[in-house]
């Protein structure tokens, strides 16, 4: 693995629904979902405007400056 593909190891900042949040290097989208208490909920997530399927959350490693948008499905009528 070359230096350009190494994950960030120290603390870094991302944006979650427009709010700054600090994470530690190697944090995946699944890690973020767990930290936010959203595991198992009906949500849709986009990182830098690209929708990330639930099956890819564990593999999607977050990077400094990523913009994460999380939408939760709400039922009603």
Walk through the language-model features, giving the residues of each.
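Ubiquitin-like/PB1-type beta-grasp interaction modules and other compact soluble beta-rich domains
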Residues: 1-76
């Amino acid at each position: 693995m070359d230096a350009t593909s190494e994950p960030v190891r120290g603390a870094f900042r991302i944006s979650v629904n427009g709010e700054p949040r600090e994470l530690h290097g190697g944090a995946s989208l699944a890690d973020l979902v767990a930290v936010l208490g959203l595991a198992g909920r009906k949500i849709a997530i986009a990182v830098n405007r690209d929708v990330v399927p639930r099956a890819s959350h564990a593999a999607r490693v977050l990077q400094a400056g990523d913009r994460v948008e999380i939408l939760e499905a709400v039922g009603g009528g």
